[in-house]
Amino acid sequence: MHWGMEMNVEQAIEYVKKNNVKFIRFQFVDILGFPKNVAYPVKAGEKGIEELREIFENGVWFDGSSITGFVGIEESDMLLKPDLSTLSVLPWRPEEKSVARVICDVYKDEKTPFEGDPRSRLKAILEELKKEMNGEYFVGPEPEFFLLKRDPHNPHRWVPADDGGYFDVEPLDDAPDIRRDIVLALENLGFHVEASHHEVAPGQHEVDFKFDNALKTADSVITFKMTIKNIAKKHGLKATFMPKPFFGMNGNGMHCHQSVWFNGEPSFYDPEGPYNGLSETCLSYIAGILSHAKALVAITNPTVNSYKRLVPGYEAPVNIAWANKNRSAIIRVPAARGKATRIEFRAPDPTCNPYLAFACMLAAGLDGIKKKMTAPEPVERNIFKMSEEEKKQLGIESVPANLAAALDELECDEVLQKALGKHIYENYMEIKRAEWDDFRTAVTDWETGKYLIY
């Protein structure tokens, strides 16, 4: 039985017994998407099984006051309710007396979901989509990452672990065995891995997994990052999903392929539609994403460093336009049609909280559908080579140049604020404004190197 399969309490207990599980991690994420957990030992005998049954049925209490973006000390008691379909043994932990994890929803009490829990927020939006429009939202992300080794000349510095480039093989690509171990670990966790390969920059890699409903995919992104970091550590390396770890190299993106289905049918395809079969629904969804793009990147590209990637060049998706094959636009529509018709939003990076990013992308696209927005004409020329005047004539704007500007846009976007909910929005803004202030007031090595001469 693998993660993703429905499981009742008795089946979960049998899974624990069969896999000789000694510890269970009850896992959730904070407002920034960092995984948190509390581990419970599985005790022997019938008494231990009864304790486990009670925990699986009722959840575990914890102090939420120390979790970023959650609650104050005066309301700290919170409850983790496990989603047993996510119960899975962690393949990088010892096989003997193994460790399993289960992803949880955060509750304020036995019956009330916590409005600051990112996973619960995405679930609520997906339930609303199902109830109001009989809709489903599917996402297929492509998170890129670097594998790093310590610089032999400076052990405090990390450098790319190989000199390979796009699709390279040995000896330029030193990491096929590591990617093999990553793929095997992901498959043990229930992932449907489609491909793995070296990316453009030295030390940069991509492992692609099959799309799924947005909730499972968000869970998958968190699990994916944990898996890669732990497998890299076993090989003496460090994995990073930092958007732009090195000047002069491509950064790490997380392009998000996505589609919405209504009444069990794909809604983005119309054999009679323009652009080789795109439906009005698809074009309105595109228009919605484009109209909210400036604010959306505050969520999908949430760090100061994110905007070192979002600069012209290095294939960075900064231009608010859409296209069919043209990768210089922020939205691309892959060639596949029929059930595979989808759009690719190219701005996101892997530092985003996937629960919040998916919730906001969906809200932006649905706003376009509900308001019957009209998408502009696709731009099939290389936008990177256009002059500012050419872009102005075509109405092509750029995403904000930094995190502060993106947060300013989010402050003006009521649709995305509603998608986040009051608690998450207010806490997120407070955290990110403070992050920007930390950066704004920091004195960097570049500055001292440039200005000490004065």
Swiss-Prot record:
Residues the record lists as binding ATP: 194, 257-259, 327, 332, 339
Compartments where found: Cytoplasm
Coiled coil regions in record: none
UniProt cross-references to Gene3D superfamilies, sorted A to Z: Glutamine synthetase, N-terminal domain, Glutamine synthetase/guanido kinase, catalytic domain
EC number: 6.3.1.2
Cofactor binding comment, as recorded: Binds 2 Mg(2+) ions per subunit.
Domain GS catalytic: 118-454
Binding residues annotated for L-glutamate, in chain numbering: 250-251, 309, 315, 327, 346
One of the GO biological process terms: glutamine biosynthetic process
Activity regulation as described: Feedback inhibited by glycine and alanine, and inhibited by low concentrations of methionine sulfoximine.
Domain (GS beta-grasp): residue spans on this chain: 19-111
Chief subcellular location: cytoplasm
Protein name: Glutamine synthetase
Protein's organism: Methanocaldococcus jannaschii (strain ATCC 43067 / DSM 2661 / JAL-1 / JCM 10045 / NBRC 100440) (Methanococcus jannaschii)
Gene encoding the protein: glnA
